[in-house]
């Protein structure tokens, strides 16, 4: 019977929620397929709220020194990247901070609307060393993934410094595949997926949302009016050079579960990392036998016309 179980769950800190899930039973080959799709969706397509720009009174550029403040503008921008917000925004909003020293300035000093929540109000921003005032404004937006300040700067009003926007609430995703046997003596797989979030969303909520995103995408593909035109002549096959595939994930080799898990445990995630090893090097990995080494070499040659050193 198909099931999704939560094997472990813990909150290590205000901005660190971790959980491990098991998805089973799966047919042979489905573990890597589903695991890879969920991992990419979790890291790239789960929305979150972040600061995209800030205005600091008396500051013209990010390298400015702020009178009476221990940190310069650049250090404050880096600290703002660490702030975690929970809540949905339909459009960008501006929030403010106005405080007099001497004091330590934290996230809780920011005046935010009631429908937004700061996950860690004690998150450090700056230190005012004398009786100076620190006045700041922040632009908050909702988005996905990670957007560099070079891209957020174009949408900010004049006088605002751009901030690298860490929208994604997902800090880390890992998965591996195990084999199991069913009552019908068929080889089955179970997918173990580990998710770590920043506290603005629970790992289970993130997993459900990623599954919904993928389900919606596949429904669109299934409902589309698909047509295809086939060429009358077979086009020449262009050989892929080694430099073209260095970033290709090892999932594209479609290896057995044993060979795949051994490579992942050895921190080999791309073909570029794999090509640094020889066949003899692979045999030195734990539980990596001659059969697995032969499989890696054969699939590497068949799919990409590449060989190990």
From Swiss-Prot:
It comes from Emiliania huxleyi. The gene is rpoA. GO terms for cellular component: chloroplast; DNA-directed RNA polymerase complex; mitochondrion. InterPro entries: DNA-dir_RNA_pol_insert, DNA-dir_RNA_pol_RpoA/D/Rpb3, DNA-dir_RpoA, RBP11-like, RNAP_asu_C, RNApol_insert_sf. Residues 237-309 are annotated as: Alpha C-terminal domain (alpha-CTD). The lineage of its organism: Eukaryota, Haptista, Haptophyta, Prymnesiophyceae, Isochrysidales. Residues 1-225 are annotated as: Alpha N-terminal domain (alpha-NTD). Signal peptide: none annotated. This is DNA-directed RNA polymerase subunit alpha. It comes from the Eukaryota.
């Amino acid at each position: 019977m198909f099931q999704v179980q939560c094997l472990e769950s813990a909150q290590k800190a205000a901005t660190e929620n971790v959980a491990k899930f098991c998805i089973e039973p799966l047919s042979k080959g489905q573990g890597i397929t589903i695991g890879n799709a969920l991992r990419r969706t979790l890291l790239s397509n789960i929305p979150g709220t972040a600061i995209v720009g800030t205005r600091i009174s008396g500051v013209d550029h990010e390298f400015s020194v702020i009178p009476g403040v221990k940190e310069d503008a650049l250090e404050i921008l880096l600290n703002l990247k660490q702030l975690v917000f929970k809540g949905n925004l339909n459009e960008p909003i501006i929030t403010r901070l106005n405080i007099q020293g001497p004091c330590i300035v934290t996230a809780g000093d920011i005046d935010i609307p009631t429908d937004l929540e700061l996950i860690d109000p004690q998150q450090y921003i700056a230190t005012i060393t004398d009786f100076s005032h620190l006045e700041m404004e922040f632009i908050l937006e909702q988005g996905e993934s990670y957007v560099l300040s070079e891209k957020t700067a174009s949408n900010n009003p004049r006088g605002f410094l751009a901030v690298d926007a860490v929208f994604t609430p997902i800090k880390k995703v890992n998965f591996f595949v195990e084999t199991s046997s069913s009552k019908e003596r068929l080889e089955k797989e179970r997918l173990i997926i580990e998710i770590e979030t920043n506290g603005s969303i629970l790992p289970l909520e993130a997993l459900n949302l990623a599954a919904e995103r993928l389900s919606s995408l596949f429904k669109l593909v299934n409902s589309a009016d698909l047509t295809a035109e086939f060429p009358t002549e077979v086009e020449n096959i262009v050989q892929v050079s080694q430099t073209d595939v260095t970033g290709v994930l090892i999932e594209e080799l479609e290896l057995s579960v044993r060979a795949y898990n051994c490579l992942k445990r050895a921190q080999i995630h791309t073909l570029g990392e794999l090509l640094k090893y020889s066949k003899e090097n692979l045999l030195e990995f734990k539980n990596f036998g001659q059969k697995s080494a032969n499989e890696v070499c054969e699939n590497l040659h068949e799919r990409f016309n590449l060989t190990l050193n």
